[in-house]
């Protein structure tokens, strides 16, 4: 709301609405359609322009939803309208942050009916959950349902009634699929016209952003929800403005500016403001408040026009000195008295520091382009049990590589850098390559985490494989009568593997637990083999002070001599790596060993448990 006198100001502000969803599911088309509707139904001079947002005024909502009055009861609107954030997607949504939640009051989750839930849909739902933002599902592209006949700009319910039984069934099945996906994520949902309680169920509105079908219901559901359940949150506040930076931009003739969404109160030209910056709070004075020049402006060169004041909810460009280090996703507060300045500086500092993590613990290094995306990324990692040592805004620097090296020296798994939508500085890249520090870079959060998790899984498998190769596996063999090829130095005998596994270098013991050398080589049909398993008959050479006929005899049963520490690992960390017959042989080995050492293979509880 821009430049309104006190009498003109309504009692409620417009709800701020964000649009999220998977790539190519129709977010931008939907916003374009909504904007186009406003332009078509308003006199050009009456359109209030915002920076980074589009206002759909109440009179436009009423005109669009007029045909619905014949079908469903509609609410008398007290809201001044709906303020849509122009840039869709969860990167911008992440920046619409405030302490303990989001600046957005409502969200539209756009889902392509024909494709259903996709990776970024799940990511969007997770962010909406994190920020506790109520949302409506726009089930888009109904015009793509085979056999659908389009009725441009009509309410969905009118179009739906004109479709064949078969087409309606196809649509309903697609909606049930979306309901199923939402149920898996813990949400009860239903088609909007079948909902009895909007606080308990998520409304699914079938639409076509292309033809405009269903847009009347979508606007009606959003406005109705906001008015019915959010009046407390939307109360108009006269006090000093609170806002959030969506983008920091260099503008010719103005220098560094911040595109800001004001969600509370009023901001005026000349006000002192405190802004969140990378290096701490920035205190500055508003030189100008800019909004886009009206579309009717004759001189096309004039992109912005100044206004004296702006009140919530609004999108505005703030021009002020010293904004170069301001960071998107950080708060903007108007200082209404000198006494409040220190308090607000402290508040801004706290808010930024809550997101910019710096600890000594082992964990990954996270870099992102804005405070909002950093916060979302850290939350995603925490939800997946991945610890974070440091989280900062900005490019990957040499210092980040040094931090990762410190972590890597203690824990290979987390000595890495996750970089979202930021560059890696040349000297950082050089050091990372030299020190073998892995940098994951992506501009889609879920892909960034996915790539890291895939790498981590492969690393853990490789580490596990290396450890497993050093462990002696349980094995049991019998010396075959009549198959003694050499009695000693080394003894060579034919054996049958009765259970488990034998490999070269494995020590052997008798049934009384006494050691009888170790396996030098295994041969099957004259060929050396790396191992032999249960059921195989092979020739083995045994090195050590062992002679067939004196220390061991034909028909003897021998076991692999599993060291006590190895037995503990087989019983705990690697128990799922043993086959059933190996587990059985291990129990026999434990029984033999405990006659000599009662604590063999005993797993003692750790002090912390």
UniProtKB/Swiss-Prot annotation:
Q: Which Gene3D superfamilies match?
A: P-loop containing nucleotide triphosphate hydrolases (3.40.50.300), Translation factors (2.40.30.10), Translation initiation factor IF- 2, domain 3 (3.40.50.10050)
Q: Where are the annotated segments for G5?
A: 208-210
* Region (G2) location: 46-50
- Where are the stretches annotated G1? 21-28
Q: Would you say which domain of life the source belongs to?
A: Archaea
Domain named tr-type G: residues: 12-230
| Role summary | Function in general translation initiation by promoting the binding of the formylmethionine-tRNA to ribosomes. Seems to function along with eIF-2.
Q: What is the protein name stated in its UniProt record?
A: Probable translation initiation factor IF-2
Q: What species was this sequence derived from?
A: Ignicoccus hospitalis (strain KIN4/I / DSM 18386 / JCM 14125)
């Amino acid at each position: 709301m821009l430049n309104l006198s006190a009498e003109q100001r309504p009692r409620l502000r417009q709800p701020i609405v964000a649009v999220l969803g998977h790539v190519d599911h129709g977010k931008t088309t939907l916003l374009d359609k909504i904007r186009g509707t406003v332009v078509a139904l308003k006199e050009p001079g009456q359109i209030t322009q915002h920076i980074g947002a589009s206002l759909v005024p109440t009179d436009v909502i009423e005109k669009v939803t007029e045909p619905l009055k014949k079908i469903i009861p509609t609410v008398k609107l007290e809201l001044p309208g709906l303020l849509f954030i122009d840039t869709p997607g969860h990167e911008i949504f992440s920046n619409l942050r405030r302490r303990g939640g989001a600046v957005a009051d409502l969200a539209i989750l756009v889902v392509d009916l024909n494709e259903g839930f996709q990776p970024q849909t799940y990511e969007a739902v997770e962010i909406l959950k994190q920020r506790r933002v109520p949302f409506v599902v726009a089930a888009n592209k109904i015009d793509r349902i085979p056999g659908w006949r389009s009725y441009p700009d009509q309410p969905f319910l009118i179009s739906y009634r004109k479709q064949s039984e078969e087409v309606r069934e196809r649509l309903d099945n697609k909606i049930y699929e979306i309901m199923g996906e939402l149920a898996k994520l813990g949400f009860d949902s239903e088609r909007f016209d079948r909902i009895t309680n909007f606080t308990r169920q998520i409304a699914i509105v079938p639409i076509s952003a292309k033809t405009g079908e269903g847009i009347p219901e979508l606007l009606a559901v959003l406005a109705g929800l906001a008015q019915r359940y959010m009046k407390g949150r939307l109360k108009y506040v006269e006090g000093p403005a609170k806002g959030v930076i969506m983008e920091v931009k260099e503008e010719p003739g103005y220098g560094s500016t911040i595109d800001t969404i004001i969600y509370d109160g009023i901001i005026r030209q000349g006000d002192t403001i405190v802004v969140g910056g990378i290096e701490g709070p920035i205190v500055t004075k508003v030189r100008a408040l800019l909004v886009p020049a009206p579309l009717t402006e004759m001189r096309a060169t004039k992109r912005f026009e100044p206004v004296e004041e702006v009140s919530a909810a609004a999108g505005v460009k703030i021009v002020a000195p010293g904004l170069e280090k301001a960071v998107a996703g950080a708060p903007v507060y108007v200082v209404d008295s000198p006494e409040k300045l220190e308090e607000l500086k402290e508040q801004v500092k706290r808010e930024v520091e809550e997101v910019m993590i710096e600890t000594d613990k082992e964990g990954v290094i996270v870099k992102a382009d804005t405070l909002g995306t950093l916060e979302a990324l850290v939350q995603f990692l925490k939800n997946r049990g991945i610890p974070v040592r440091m989280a900062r805004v900005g490019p990957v620097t040499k210092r980040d590589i040094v931090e990762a090296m410190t972590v890597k020296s203690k824990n290979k798994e987390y000595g890495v850098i996750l970089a979202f939508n930021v560059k890696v500085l040349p000297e950082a890249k050089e050091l990372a390559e030299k020190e073998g520090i892995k940098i994951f870079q992506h501009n889609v959060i879920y892909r960034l985490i996915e790539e890291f998790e895939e790498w981590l899984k492969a690393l853990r498998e490789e580490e596990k494989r290396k450890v497993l190769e050093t462990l002696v596996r349980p094995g049991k063999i019998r010396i075959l009568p009549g198959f003694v090829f050499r009695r000693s130095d080394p003894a060579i005998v034919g054996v049958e593997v009765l259970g488990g596994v034998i490999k070269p270098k494995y020590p052997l013991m008798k049934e009384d637990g006494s050691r009888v050398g170790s396996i030098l080589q295994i041969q099957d049909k004259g060929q050396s083999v790396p191992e032999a398993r249960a059921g195989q008959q092979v020739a083995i050479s045994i090195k050590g002070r062992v002679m067939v006929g004196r220390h061991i005899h034909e028909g003897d049963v021998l076991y692999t001599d599993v060291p006590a520490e190895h037995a503990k690992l087989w019983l705990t960390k690697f128990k799922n790596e043993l086959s059933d017959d190996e587990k059985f042989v291990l129990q026999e080995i434990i029984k033999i060993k405990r006659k000599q050492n009662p604590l063999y293979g005993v797993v003692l509880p750790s002090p912390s448990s």
